[in-house]
């Protein structure tokens, strides 16, 4: 199966805006900005761009407006305002217009993929192979390389007990706007690819969309996927039963016939997914390009001798 997940432009009604301020007495900066993640904004600005102690910069996001992920990115204007407020010793305000936001704010998606599924004679999944080309745009954004890796490739097992999963992602720089997190950031791309492939498998095997999924749902937990993630629990059959009941699938054929009598077509489609929320641990996320520390876990052991070890 060959699929294109086309490039999208967030295009929020409220363009990005920022005010940079500098307090000469305390040598501290304040940036008011419509950013979805002010903590990451401050971290990246101080550590990687301005070379300032983090406590010397305060980033405040009072009203963000629409963002959809595009306002997570650390934009050049935010840094320039902060720097210029000290240089000129005054507050500086900047607001993007709709045209420049449409062209230069971070875009989303832009994957071209080829996927293959091996099955046995009963429609049980044996192996999945995916090769994706991810367009990152002209240069890296905050989460550009994390989206098609830790947020996409690790979700391609879905909720199915496929024993073998192989994922290869090639990322490219092109003469386009940078791509960053957008509405699910990698996870919708994974679901779209996997569910389109599962639908195709049902057609090839002559099975219903309901049945192909039921035959392959994970039933034993905890379940270690072949692509890093471990699922602690889940009841996908119950979810499918509930969805069928809510949609009155049992009465679908009657509704389909009634539509046909009026010269109309009626169909029914299935899509199921599992989503990983959050990105961690930080060392893995960082290695895959998140460019920001996220959350970690720790352990303290008190030994019989009274000594303490912190992991």
Label every model-predicted segment:
Residues 12, 69-121, 179-204, 225-250:
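Glycine-rich and small/hydrophobic secondary-structure elements
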Residues 15, 25-29, 52-56, 88-92, ...:
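Short coil/turn connectors at secondary-structure junctions
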Residues 1-44, 145-161, 179, 235-285, ...:
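Extended, polar/acidic
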Residues 35-38, 62-67, 96-106, 132-137, ...:
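Acidic, glycine-rich active-site loops and adjacent beta-strand->loop/helix elements
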Residues 59-62, 173-178, 214-224, 303-308:
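Short acidic (Asp/Glu) and glycine-rich catalytic loops that position anionic groups and cofactors
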Residues 55-62, 89-99, 126-131, 162, ...:
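Beta-strand segments within the central parallel beta-sheet cores of soluble alpha/beta enzyme folds
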Residues 18-88, 145-155, 183-211, 242, ...:
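Alpha-helical support elements that line or immediately flank enzyme active sites
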Residues 1-18, 110-197, 279-280, 284-296:
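Glycine-rich loop/linker segments at domain edges
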């Amino acid at each position: 199966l060959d699929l294109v997940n086309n490039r999208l432009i967030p295009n929020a009604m409220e363009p990005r805006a920022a005010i940079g301020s500098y307090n000469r007495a305390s040598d501290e900066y304040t940036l008011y900005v419509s950013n979805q993640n002010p903590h990451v904004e401050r971290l990246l600005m101080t550590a990687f761009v301005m070379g300032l102690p983090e406590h010397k910069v305060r980033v405040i996001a009072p009203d963000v407006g629409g963002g959809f992920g595009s306002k997570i990115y650390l934009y050049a204007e935010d840094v320039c305002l902060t720097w210029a407020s000290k240089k000129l010793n005054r507050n500086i305000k900047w607001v993007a217009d709709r045209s420049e936001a449409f062209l230069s704010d971070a875009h989303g998606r832009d994957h071209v993929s080829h996927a293959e599924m091996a099955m046995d004679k009963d429609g049980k999944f044996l192996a999945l192979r995916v090769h994706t080309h991810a367009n990152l745009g002209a240069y890296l954004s905050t989460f550009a390389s994390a989206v098609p890796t830790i947020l996409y490739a690790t979700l391609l097992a879905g909720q199915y007990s496929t024993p073998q999963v192989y994922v290869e992602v090639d990322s490219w720089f092109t003469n386009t706007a940078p791509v960053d997190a957008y509405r699910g950031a990698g996870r919708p791309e994974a679901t779209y690819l996997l569910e389109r492939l599962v639908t195709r498998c049902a057609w090839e095997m002559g099975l219903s969309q309901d049945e192909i999924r039921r035959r392959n749902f994970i039933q034993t937990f905890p379940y270690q996927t072949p692509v890093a993630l471990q699922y602690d629990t889940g009841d996908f059959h119950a979810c499918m039963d509930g969805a069928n009941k809510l949609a009155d699938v049992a009465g679908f054929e009657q509704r389909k016939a009634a539509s046909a009598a009026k010269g109309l077509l009626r169909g029914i489609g299935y899509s199921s997914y599992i989503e990983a929320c959050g990105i961690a641990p930080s060392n893995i996320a960082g290695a895959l390009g998140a460019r920001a520390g996220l959350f970690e876990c720790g352990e303290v052991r008190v030994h019989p001798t009274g000594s303490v070890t912190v992991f």
